[in-house]
Regions:
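N-terminal amphipathic/basic leader segments beginning at the initiator methionine
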Residues: 1-53
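Conserved mixed alpha/beta catalytic, RNA-binding, or beta-rich assembly cores of soluble enzyme
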Residues: 61-67, 71, 75-163
């Protein structure tokens, strides 16, 4: 593995391991939830961090095992997704994937968030700004599939790109 390359599913982990943690914007929210935003606009930085260019948002909390907090966090997540796609060009295709184990509350937030979204990439909805697809994906132990395998196939088929 290269000296300047770090691997994690989360951009935030890679920032911390690479000594770039000052690039993460931290914001305290209600119920002890912290929002951390990593904006990798620069190609050189995104290469060093080992993540494609983009905006990465992480929510950190220890209270996701409580239904009240989980519901609040799911609302925040779905709102964040809506904000992130709001700046895209009309007709862009957005693929939102919730990862986790739906059988364990603390790990089911991805699935719960996908249920809150309103997919608009359906044939009868023709006048939407962007075309949203939402999918929840279980963990490898429950599905036998690695997340990147399924996401790669979805990405190839859906081709979520900004409209030209």
């Amino acid at each position: 593995m290269e000296k300047d390359f770090f691997y994690s599913d989360m951009a935030l982990d890679n920032l911390e391991r690479g000594g770039f943690e000052s690039l993460a914007l931290h914001k305290k929210l209600s119920y002890g939830i912290e929002q951390i935003v990593v904006n990798l606009k620069d190609k050189v930085l995104s290469d060093k961090v080992g993540k494609p260019q983009g905006v990465y948002v992480t929510y950190d909390t220890s209270k996701a095992t409580d239904d009240r907090y989980a519901d609040y966090l799911v609302r925040i997540l779905s709102s964040t997704i809506t904000q992130l796609v709001g700046g895209l060009a009309r007709g862009s295709i957005v693929l939102s994937v919730g990862l986790g184990n739906g059988e364990v509350l603390a790990d089911s937030l991805g699935e719960m968030t996908m249920r809150k979204l309103r997919p608009t990439r359906v044939e009868y909805l023709t006048d939407t700004k962007f075309k949203l697809c939402a999918h929840s994906l279980g963990v490898q132990g429950a599905t036998g599939l690695k997340s990147h395998e399924v996401l790669g196939a979805l990405n190839d088929k859906v081709n979520p790109l900004p409209s030209s």
